[in-house]
Amino acid sequence: MMTQNADKKREQIQMFCMDDLVPQDHLLRLIDQAIDWSFIYDLVIDKYSADNGRPSMDPVMLIKIPFIQYLYGIRSMRQTVKEIEVNVAYRWFLGLEMMDKVPHFSTFGKNYTRRFKDTDLFEQIFSRILQECYKYRLIDPSEVFVDATHVKARANSKKMRKRIADEEALFFEEQLKKEINEDREAHGKKPLKEKKEDPKDPPSCGGSSDGKEEKTVKESTTDPESGWFRKGEHKNVFAYSVQTACDKNGWILGYSVNPGNQHDSRTFKSLYDKIKDIGIQTLVADAGYKTPAIAKLLLDDGITPLLPYKRPMTKDGFFKKAEYVYDEYFDCYVCPNDQVLAYHTTNRSGYREYKSCGIVCEGCPYLKQCTESRDHVKVVTRHIWEPHMEKCEDIRHMIGMKEVYAQRKETVERLFGTAKENHGFRYTQMIGKARMEMKVGLTFACMNLKKLAKMIARKGKRGAQKCLLLIKYTLFEPKTRKTLLEC
């Protein structure tokens, strides 16, 4: 029999408690039980006046509003406020009554501009939630997985301009210069002189009065701090690169935000400085991080770098570099035709150049597989930190390392997939690197807290079941009491 009473209860007046309307297993209830949000007051106390001014909005509520947005992947702050107006669980989480007015969607933006801009508040919130995970001993920092993903910026790919940008200094530049000169002196060469461009040179010559290298980059007119990123063979977008580190259990340990046109190996140091003191034994990363500088940095700090095989970039039909054997004693290379490539110089990039004799190579039967140079001279380069790269190759072939590297898809890559699928991480509505860092910090904080809350609830449920089991056997089967108490 069909019942038709859908509209009869709309005008009812009832008395109820807000707490009764939120299910006991609701995610926001679990999160609220997992952490004491009062720590936010200590973080923002210096941002508010103590003895004058109008009463402000509760800072905890102010932080919880974007937290709801990133937790549920709501596309904008405006839509988040609309959802809060009609969602009882959201109101309960924020401490609002049914008839309380929800803050305007621009409230958080104004507070960010006036109070939180140019501060590390959101990174501190991420760190505080991470400390809770450490407190429950859920994190194992012995194996750390590092990777980067790109988040599409709020910028039209057709609105851009070209500008000349100075090449940013590498984090190992000073140390590399020092070791290059030491290597040259050990080989009887003079130290390299500092580059000095003639200030009279016109810009068309590529020179600059301060001696810095320059390059032409594409800059968005909407979000100049984003970077031009090649997304595929036929698609380029403005984006931000988010580097992330996590442990083998999927807990996010740190992050850094950079323009999308900067290579992961160049921006690795900013992330590494945040996590290097947490007790890392093995650091796992993809081939983008396999550089001599990163290998040396990790090995010098006593960390085992686990980096994959990197395919040689040799042209088809030519000998690969591995076919030229390095003789460490005589410091030379031996080609497939058993001819010597002797040391020639050490260049500014830190590579030793080994060259063959053009007269000898001219009549070599393997010449077409070796070089295309007009003078028939083959040049093979070797970085001064190449021994560290060779150590990485030895580590890669150790027993068990292949299985550890395979965990990347179950850890850091899974985190990126979850963030993009459930937490609105495919693109950002924020403009500027600072706001992007806020989004990343709160998104990763809510992912860690969501996981922590569920684990605490699951653990509490198991504990309650054990207590009931113990009471049952204590009352009805006294013989088993001693055995259960010992367990």
Predicted feature residues:
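Hydrophobic alpha-helical membrane-insertion signals
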Residues: M1-R29
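A short, ordered amphipathic alpha-helix with a cationic face
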Residues: Q4-K8, R54-S56, M98
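Generic alpha-helical segment signature
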Residues: E11, Q24, W37, D58, ...
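Basic, short loop/linker segments at the boundary and entry of helix-turn-helix/winged-helix-like folds
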Residues: Q24-F67, Y72-G73, I384
